Every structure is written in structure tokens, then in C-alpha cells.
């Protein structure tokens, strides 16, 4: 969304032509009339050279780096990603879409000029020259919070694809959504149909996931919508938690809407339009009004690589409740029912690997603590449905594997196991396998 160049005058009048009359004088001495009084804005600029210099910077170019006041009241370094004119504003009246360089792209937002410290302006950087990854400068608390809430999509992208992806999705198109009783601030761009390009906020039916431009449309829809839970089969219920299996082929519109919704909170997720190939497992909190989606994961119906999970999301309004860990555990319970080992789709992001490594660590160490005698990696894989390579890499990262006489040996000192278990943290909500009523997918065609 480039901006066309504007022709600007320098404010100086052209010299009079030969056939023009000289300006009238004001008195016998031939002097010019006194200039008109300065406006307040002009007076400020004239009396404050720094103000004049700052005004000369405007509008800021895309790529400019500057300090920006965030909602915490503090200034943070940002990079201008895009700009747009303010309706009915002056020549230099723009809003600026900025990326906080210390933080994840999900915090990118439109800002007003008064949030920017023009004294800190650095000139625009050529994107072709600058091809660096900004290191995250976070406190331990901030990093832990992002580790616990971050969810990752189907795949990470190579450098060229990542640049193309970030250019196409650099400006968030939908700022907020309403879903059930929550108004949720979105994190990323999602490729909604063109007719929704002018929307800042979307209204979702929390049961069928149809989305609308206006609140009145949602209210009319809710009076007619018969659904009180996701379509598909309820395969698990324990207390107030339910899990529904949704076939992307049988419920195509729901599955596509779920992908649109998920992309608002997943950065490098590939949006699959061919949802026929996937099953979606939608986790809900249930009450007397219905079953309210809190998150989901998807998996391919047929995976040659033994992937048991393609994409996973816990909605922001339900995070930090253990649902992400529950979804990972549930994917392995399905693998056990299938009689197969499973693994998440690769490659994993750093934070995605962190989530899985935490799950694998807790599951494996609990077994090693209780087990008496020798146990092989294959036996651990058979019991847990975790792929042998994932078990080996996890135990190696904990330094619990030694190579002796041509084979890997697990060294499970009880004190060491306890220390690692404590470091791994809580396991989240437990999946009660006895409540799972499910038959593995078989192609009906």
C-alpha cells in the first residue's frame, strides 16, 4: 500500500514577471507594508527551531525508526511499517502502523503522531540492505509469559518465503473480533474475502463461526442459528469440557471459518483452503447456554510422516489455563487409540518445540520414576505413543542418555528425575482416557 508522492511547494512566491506591477508601497519612503501577524502555530515554529526541524520530517517515511509511547506509558523502539492519511487532515496528518522491534509482531498497531518522539527519529532503512533478525529483549517474566501463550502454525518458512509472507501480511487487517462474551484484540493478518477489507472489527457466531460486519447482523443471525456446539461428533466429555471432531470435508464452511479465525492469532501458519484433508478437534467449555470453543488442533486424515497434529491454537481469552497442554496430550491419546506413534508436524518453531519438550519431559520422567528395572526407548514409545526420535532427543537434552557398548542407555537417578520434573512445571489439565469415545478415521469413499 504505497503512497503516491505529493508535490510540495517551498512557500516562496515566484519573482514578478516583467509585465507585472510592483507591489504597492506604504508611505513616502517606498517601504513595503508590514507582514501579517503570525498564526499561533507559525509563532511556535519560528520561536522553536527544533519544532521547525521536526515538522520538516513529516510525514515519516516507511522504514523510519523512532521511539513510541505504548499502552504501558513507556517509550519503546519501533519501525514504521505503513502510513495512511487521516481523513480531513492536513498535508502531513498521517497515522503510522508500527512494529515494536523488541517484541513479537502481534503487538503491531496503528499509532497517532503524538505517541511518537520525533527527537529520536532515525532515517528510513533500506529493506534490501537490512536483513537481520531482531533479538528479543525481554525480562524473564515477559519471556515466560510469551512462552506460555505462544502458539505456532503449520510450518516455519525459509528466509525468502518469510520476507514475502511478512510483506503481504505486514498490516493487520482486522483489529478486534467479538466471539461469544469476549471482545478479543487480534494479533496478525488473516486473508478474509475482499468484501471484508474495510472492516476493523468482525463479529463471529461462536457456534457455527460465521462472521459478520455489524453487531446487528450477528444478533439477527443468533436468533436463527440452531447450533449450540461445533458441528461433528462429540468424542470426549469430562466435567464441563467437551471435544468435538469436525470433518473438514463434511463441514467445509465451518472448517474454513475456523482457519480464518485461527490465522488472526497465528503468524506463520499456512492457511489451507483444502480443508477436506483435515480433521479438526475443537475443545469447548460447556454450560447451560451451549459449548463455547476455547481452542482446537487439526491433523491430517492420512499422514505418511506419522504426524498427529498439524496446527494448534488456544484462543487468547482462554490461555494460561492449561488448555494448550491438554490439546497436545489429547493428540497423543488419539495416537494410542490408533495404535500408532505420533509426532507434531515439522518444522517446529523454537517456542513450539519448547511446548512439546515440556510435555515429553513430564510424560517420560513420570514413567521412569515409577518403573522398576530396565526399559528401552522402544518400550517408552509403545507406552506413550511418542516417536522414538522425540524420546531420544528429549532424554539427551536432559543428559539422561549415555552411549555404552554400542547402545543408548537411560540413566535415571531418582534425584535427577525429581529435579527435571520440577523444572518442567505443571502438566496442565489431565485427559481422562476412559472418557474418550472415538473410532479412528477411515475414508468412506
Swiss-Prot record:
Chloroplast in keyword set:
no
Q: Where in the cell is it found?
A: Nucleus
Q: Active-site positions, per UniProt?
A: 345 (proton donor/acceptor)
The keyword Magnesium is assigned to this record: no
- Please list the residue ranges annotated as the Tudor-knot domain: 60-118
* Domain of life per record: Eukaryota
Q: Name one GO cellular component term.
A: nucleus
Q: Which residues carry this modification: N6-acetyllysine?
A: 269
Major enzyme class = transferase
Q: Which UniProt keywords apply?
A: Acetylation, Activator, Acyltransferase, Chromatin regulator, Metal-binding, Nucleus, Transcription, Transcription regulation, Transferase, Zinc, Zinc-finger
Q: What is its main location?
A: nucleus
- Polar residues: compositionally biased ranges: 1-23
Induction info: Up-regulated upon UV-B exposure.
Span list, region Disordered: 1-58
Q: Which reaction does it catalyse?
A: L-lysyl-[protein] + acetyl-CoA = N(6)-acetyl-L-lysyl-[protein] + CoA + H(+)
EC number in record: 2.3.1.48
Q: Which residues are listed for acetyl-CoA binding in this entry?
A: 312-314, 319-325, 349
- Name one molecular function that GO assigns to this entry: zinc ion binding
| Biological process terms in GO annotation | DNA repair; regulation of DNA-templated transcription; response to UV-B
SUPFAM superfamilies given for it? Acyl-CoA N-acyltransferases (Nat), Chromo domain-like
The UniProt similarity line reads: Belongs to the MYST (SAS/MOZ) family.
Additional record remark: Knockdown expression of both HAM1 and HAM2 results in earlier flowering.
* Protein name according to UniProt: Histone acetyltransferase of the MYST family 2
The uppermost taxa in this organism's lineage are: Eukaryota, Viridiplantae, Streptophyta, Embryophyta, Tracheophyta
Amino acid at each position: 500500500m504505497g503512497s503516491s508522492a505529493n508535490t510540495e511547494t517551498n512557500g516562496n512566491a515566484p519573482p514578478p514577471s516583467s509585465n507585472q506591477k510592483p507591489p504597492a508601497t506604504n508611505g513616502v519612503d517606498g517601504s513595503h507594508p508590514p507582514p501579517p501577524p503570525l498564526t499561533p502555530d507559525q509563532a511556535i515554529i519560528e520561536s522553536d527551531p527544533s519544532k521547525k526541524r521536526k515538522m520538516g520530517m513529516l510525514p515519516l517515511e516507511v522504514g523510519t525508526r523512532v521511539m513510541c509511547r505504548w499502552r504501558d506509558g513507556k517509550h519503546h523502539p519501533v519501525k514504521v511499517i505503513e502510513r495512511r492519511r487521516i481523513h480531513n487532515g492536513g498535508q502531513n496528518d498521517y497515522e503510522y502502523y508500527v512494529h515494536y522491534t523488541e517484541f513479537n509482531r502481534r503487538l503491531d498497531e496503528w499509532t497517532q503522531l503524538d505517541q511518537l518522539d520525533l527527537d529520536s527519529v532515525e532515517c528510513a532503512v533500506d529493506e534490501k540492505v537490512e536483513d537481520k533478525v531482531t533479538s528479543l529483549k525481554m525480562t524473564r517474566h515477559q519471556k515466560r509469559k510469551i512462552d506460555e501463550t505462544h502458539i505456532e502454525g503449520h510450518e516455519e518458512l525459509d528466509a525468502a518465503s518469510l520476507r514475502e509472507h511478512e510483506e503481504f501480511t505486514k498490516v493487520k487487517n482486522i483489529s478486534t473480533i467479538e466471539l461469544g462474551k469476549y471482545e478479543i484484540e487480534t494479533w496478525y493478518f488473516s486473508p478474509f474475502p475482499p468484501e471484508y477489507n474495510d472492516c476493523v472489527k468482525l463479529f463471529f457466531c461462536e457456534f457455527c463461526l460465521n462472521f459478520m460486519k455489524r453487531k446487528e447482523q450477528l444478533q439477527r443471525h443468533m436468533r436463527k442459528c440452531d447450533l449450540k456446539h461445533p458441528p461433528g461428533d462429540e468424542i470426549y466429555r469430562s466435567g464441563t469440557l467437551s471435544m468435538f471432531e469436525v470433518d473438514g470435508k463434511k463441514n467445509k464452511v465451518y472448517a474454513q471459518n475456523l482457519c480464518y479465525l485461527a490465522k488472526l492469532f497465528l503468524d506463520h501458519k499456512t492457511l489451507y483452503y483444502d480443508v477436506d484433508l483435515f480433521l479438526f478437534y475443537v475443545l469447548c467449555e460447556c454450560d447451560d447456554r451451549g459449548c463455547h470453543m476455547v481452542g482446537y488442533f487439526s491433523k491430517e486424515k492420512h499422514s505418511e510422516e506419522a504426524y498427529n497434529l498439524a496446527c494448534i491454537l488456544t484462543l487468547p481469552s482462554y490461555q494460561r489455563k492449561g488448555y494448550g497442554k491438554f490439546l497436545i496430550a489429547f493428540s497423543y491419546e488419539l495416537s494410542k487409540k490408533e495404535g500408532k506413534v505420533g509426532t507434531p508436524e515439522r518444522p517446529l518453531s523454537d517456542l513450539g518445540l519448547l511446548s512439546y519438550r515440556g510435555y515429553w519431559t513430564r510424560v517420560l520422567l513420570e514413567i521412569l520414576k515409577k518403573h522398576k528395572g530396565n526399559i528401552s526407548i522402544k518400550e517408552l514409545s509403545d507406552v506413550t505413543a511418542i516417536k522414538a526420535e522425540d524420546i531420544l532427543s528429549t532424554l539427551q537434552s536432559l543428559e539422561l542418555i549415555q552411549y555404552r557398548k554400542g547402545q543408548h542407555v537411560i540413566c535415571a537417578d531418582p534425584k535427577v528425575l525429581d529435579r527435571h520434573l520440577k523444572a518442567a512445571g505443571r502438566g496442565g489439565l489431565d485427559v481422562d482416557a476412559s472418557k474418550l469415545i472415538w473410532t479412528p478415521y477411515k475414508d468412506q469413499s
